[in-house]
């Protein structure tokens, strides 16, 4: 696995600490699971096949960091990663998404990732080729291309152009090259010929689900039919970007990209299944549980290890890491079918957030809400400062409202902060150049309606 080999479990936890407060146990479990992917890659081939990832089940109330841990992990390790909602799936045979689609989504993510890497690797070469093409267009030098038989059959516009002598003054080319590189020609208009990437409107679907065998005519005949060209009149600056992208695309081997992507999805892929508690059968409902027990049974072979057909070929799920998360406030973990429970050997309980956690959430993370509002209002020329008491009061209000109503964890801070900054955000353009200090009294004044509504006024000192 790329990147993660540079991180020890302790370093992975340290990276997560920059964005997520507390939940050490969950962070440690995820860090060890990621490090084990790297350790497995170093094993001898004959033994490597015997080592499968230990899937993780994160249990905890909403808003304590389950999804955020998954999001940050995906960015950190740069592995193919997809996040899916368990509630979106239905049992095979019913209308809706089937569980195989999560594996197809993972492969798509892997293809995008590998393709971006390959495109990045050929950027410099693509720039040079694009520059030569652009100089040709600016000089009016156009090549005469033979007409493809298919172009005549399908009435494609002719690619024929007037060919100019090859002895175009090299001095003139060099002069245009220098003007191009200096940006002098950026606003000039130029007509360029590009490949038409608009997909055909007609698509073929099977009754197995729209995305299961969604075969477009473009996929079927892309190699057979000629690429349709079209003329576009754009600025030179825009033409550079368009031609660079087209040349880069021509330089990469998509077969190689797909082969690498499938391999990476199989060995490094991570699938995060959110809201898994919502497909637990509580025993209170009558009738068929289309999106509950049936979905759980469909998940079993994928998590255990099977082969899923995708448009890029068969993909084995044996070594994909599955991380599931759920609040389990209505259903219990034991309400999941026993076979599915057994597929998640590592179980982590995330703790509800305390007032002290809220204070830390407002102060410590790199993307703390307090910092976000400071930066947003700084764009209007307004400087925001917070007193220590103000931050503690905001945390206390959020915590108490959670206690008195639905506990939505750290998401409550978004509601409280938005209400707190409602007036300031509205009047910010008129306050340009001023420094505003947020005090505890200001917080109480701005949030008095919320405090009265939830009757938490009496709890705040």
UniProtKB/Swiss-Prot annotation:
ATP binds at residues 21, 63-68, 274, 339, 411. GO terms for molecular function: ATP binding; ATP hydrolysis activity; peptidase activity; proteasome-activating activity. One of its GO terms (biological process) is proteolysis involved in protein catabolic process. Gene3D superfamilies: 1.10.8.60, DNA helicase RuvA subunit, C-terminal domain, P-loop containing nucleotide triphosphate hydrolases. SUPFAM superfamilies: P-loop containing nucleoside triphosphate hydrolases (SSF52540). GO terms for cellular component: HslUV protease complex. InterPro entries: AAA+_ATPase, ATP-dep_Clp_protease_ClpX, ATPase_AAA_core, Clp_ATPase_C, HslU, P-loop_NTPase. Its main location: cytoplasm. It is found in: Cytoplasm. It holds the Pfam family AAA_2. Keywords: ATP-binding, Chaperone, Cytoplasm, Nucleotide-binding. The keyword Oxidoreductase does not apply. A double ring-shaped homohexamer of HslV is capped on each side by a ring-shaped HslU homohexamer. The assembly of the HslU/HslV complex is dependent on binding of ATP. Belongs to the ClpX chaperone family. HslU subfamily. HAMAP family: HslU. ATPase subunit of a proteasome-like degradation complex; this subunit has chaperone activity. The binding of ATP and its subsequent hydrolysis by HslU are essential for unfolding of protein substrates subsequently hydrolyzed by HslV. HslU recognizes the N-terminal part of its protein substrates and unfolds these before they are guided to HslV for hydrolysis. This is ATP-dependent protease ATPase subunit HslU.
């Amino acid at each position: 696995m790329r990147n993660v080999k540079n991180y020890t479990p302790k370093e992975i936890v340290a990276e997560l600490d920059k964005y997520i407060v507390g939940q050490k146990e969950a962070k440690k479990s995820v860090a060890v699971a990621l490090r084990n992917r790297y350790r497995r890659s170093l094993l001898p081939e004959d033994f490597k096949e015997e080592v499968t990832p230990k899937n993780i089940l994160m249990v905890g109330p909403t808003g304590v960091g389950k999804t955020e841990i998954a999001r940050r992990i995906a960015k950190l390790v740069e592995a193919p990663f997809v996040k899916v909602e368990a509630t979106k799936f239905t049992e095979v045979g019913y209308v809706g998404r089937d569980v195989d689609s999560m594996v197809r989504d993972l492969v798509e993510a892997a293809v995008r990732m590998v393709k971006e890497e390959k495109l990045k690797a050929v950027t410099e070469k693509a720039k040079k080729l694009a520059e030569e093409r652009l100089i040709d267009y600016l000089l009016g030098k156009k090549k005469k291309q033979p007409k493809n038989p298919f172009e005549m059959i399908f009435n494609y516009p002719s690619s024929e152009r007037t060919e100019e002598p090859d002895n175009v003054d090299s001095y003139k080319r060099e002069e245009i090259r220098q003007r191009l590189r200096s940006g002098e020609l950026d606003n000039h208009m130029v007509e360029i010929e590009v490949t038409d990437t608009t997909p055909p409107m007609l698509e073929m679907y099977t009754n197995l689900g729209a995305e299961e065998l969604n075969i477009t005519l473009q996929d079927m005949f892309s190699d057979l039919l000629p690429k349709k060209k079209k003329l576009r009149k754009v600025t030179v600056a825009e033409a550079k970007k368009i031609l660079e992208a087209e040349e880069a695309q021509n330089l990469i081997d998509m077969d190689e990209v797909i082969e690498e992507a499938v391999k990476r999805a199989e060995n490094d892929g991570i699938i995060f299944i959110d809201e898994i508690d919502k497909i637990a059968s509580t025993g209170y409902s009558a009738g068929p549980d289309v999106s509950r027990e049936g979905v759980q049974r469909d998940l079993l072979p994928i998590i255990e290890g099977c082969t899923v057909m995708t448009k890029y070929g068969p993909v084995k799920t044996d070594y994909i890491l599955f991380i599931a998360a759920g609040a389990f406030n209505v259903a219990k973990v034991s309400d999941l079918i026993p076979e599915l429970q057994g597929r998640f050997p590592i179980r982590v309980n995330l703790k509800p957030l305390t007032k002290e956690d809220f204070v830390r959430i407002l102060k410590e993370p790199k993307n703390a809400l307090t910092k976000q509002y400071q930066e947003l209002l700084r764009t209007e020329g307004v400087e925001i400062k917070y007193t220590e008491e103000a931050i503690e009061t905001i945390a206390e209000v959020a915590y108490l409202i959670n206690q008195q109503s639905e506990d939505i964890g750290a998401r409550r801070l978004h509601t409280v902060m938005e209400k707190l900054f409602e007036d300031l955000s509205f009047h910010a353009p008129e306050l340009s150049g001023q420094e505003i200090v947020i005090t505890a009294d200001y917080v109480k004044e701005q949030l008095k309606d919320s405090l009265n509504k939830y009757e938490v006024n009496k709890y705040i000192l």
